[in-house]
């Protein structure tokens, strides 16, 4: 009688990854449906009912995965962060580049990934300004995402410190870059130049200036 119980136990263990994969697949399907509707109708005019119909699931099932559209937005931002971190860790050329180029590449890739969803991102950032929003930097729901991003940036700056590219900046360097990143996204949202070229020029100039100031402590850049 032991063998059947062991077999059942193995079946249960083997079923867990499959259930997790199915749940993640459902989350991805919901996100794709939501992003398509956000592009058509906008973030505010898209209802959870419309998202569930587009994703071909019951509205109650949608709420099991995402309580609100803000939860969907947080999931989207997590997916984008995962993509950028994975890209950075696999791109040896960027990892070996000077610090300004590494930091430029990170923000550039974020902007490139966000470009198809510009209106949605604008709505998300406006919601993030509301203290009661889950998207607010002060909310508990957004803290895990923010800390992962800060650690990612801090690791890059720490390597630059070890290589002597910049003096020790500690955690404040990661916070400063995060604020700069936010400022660049805000500028990008307002940029109406062809190909957002003004944003890219501003990004390049600011990073070169900041790195020079850290290394030389002078304004002659």
Please tell me what each predicted stretch does:
Residues 1-25, 36, 220:
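N-terminal intrinsically disordered/low-complexity leader segments
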Residues 2, 29, 37-75, 79:
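Helix-turn-helix
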Residues 75, 89-123, 143-144, 148:
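Hydrophobic alpha-helical connector segments
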Residues 88-95, 124-132, 160, 188-192:
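Secondary-structure edge/capping motif, primarily at the C-terminal ends of alpha-helices
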Residues 114-140, 151-157, 186:
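Amphipathic alpha-helical segments used for helix-helix packing
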Residues 135-162, 171-182, 201, 209:
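Amphipathic alpha-helical packing segments from all-alpha helical-bundle domains
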Residues 174-196, 209-220:
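Amphipathic C-terminal alpha-helical segment
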């Amino acid at each position: 009688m032991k063998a059947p119980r062991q077999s059942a136990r193995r079946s249960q263990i083997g079923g867990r990854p499959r259930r997790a994969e199915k749940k993640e697949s459902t989350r991805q399907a919901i996100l794709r449906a939501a992003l398509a509707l956000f592009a058509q109708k906008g973030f505010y005019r898209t209802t959870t009912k419309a998202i569930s119909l587009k994703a071909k699931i019951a509205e109650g099932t949608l709420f099991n995965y995402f309580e609100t559209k803000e939860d969907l937005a947080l999931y989207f931002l997590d997916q984008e962060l995962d993509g950028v971190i994975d890209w950075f860790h696999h791109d040896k050329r960027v990892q070996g580049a000077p610090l300004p180029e590494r930091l430029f590449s990170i923000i550039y890739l974020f902007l490139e990934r966000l470009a198809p969803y510009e209106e949605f991102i604008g709505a998300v950032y406006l919601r993030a300004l509301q203290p009661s929003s889950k998207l607010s930097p002060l909310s508990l729901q957004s803290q895990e995402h923010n800390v992962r991003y800060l650690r990612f940036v801090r690791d890059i700056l720490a390597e630059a410190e070890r290589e002597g590219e910049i003096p020790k900046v500690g955690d404040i360097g990661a916070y400063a870059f995060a604020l700069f990143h936010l400022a660049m996204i805000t500028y990008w949202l307002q940029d109406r130049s062809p190909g957002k070229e003004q944003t890219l020029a501003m990004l390049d100039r600011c990073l070169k200036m900041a790195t020079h100031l850290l290394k030389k402590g002078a304004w002659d850049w």
